Amino acid sequence: MPAPPFKITVLGSGTSVGVPTIGCHCAVCTSTDPRDNRLRPSILISYEGRNVLIDTTPDFRTQALRAHIERLHAVVFTHAHADHAMGLDDFRPFNFRQSGDIPVYAAPDTMNSIRRCFPYIFDSEEKKTNVPHIEPRLLDGSPFDLFGLKFLPIPILHGPHTIYGFRFGNAAYLTDHSEIPDSSMDLLRSLDVIFLDALRYKPHPTHSTVERSIKTVEKLGVRRAFFTHICHDLGHERAEIGRASCRERV
């Protein structure tokens, strides 16, 4: 069965501290270009009247209001670092508006880390009070179905840690990667759209660079690519000029 048509909304594409960065007076952080205002990285996938969120950033409340998200049907976590998980408590308004617990998908180590951060959300007694109501579902690396759309976990390296990116239909979302193993590259063939980590131009121990991610796009032959987890080293206008001069897909 073919994947249902879906819409991807980019809720944030900034690095862990966001852009502008607190206390910074560089050209990007003081830019008046709204495209240089980047919240923490997350996307929303909408289809068949459903909304599936990848990661709950500390900016999630702002992101939900900006994108007019009124209902949330499932959440998928890439990993448990603060810039990807600390917005979980902002689920409460969705519980007020819709019945039932919201399914939350994550690898076992990611779920355990989130549980340690938010023990009251996982406590059955606390569920009787005004806390987010979720249904934890553990990922084992196998494909899983969400409302007719298949999601495939893609193992990627975030420094010394293995985390998940996800392929869904003809698209894939990979953030916070310093390396994509060959076995995972094989799972990313025949894509139309990909989101890749591109923190900055200079090398970083736990994140990809612009040039490295461009090479990944070329190797995969993806029709269209978007970069995310971008820091204040990259102003949008300058990056777009550089992109137009060297690569058509990105």
Predicted regions span which residues?
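Cap/insert and terminal regions of metallo-dependent hydrolase folds
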Residues: E179-R247
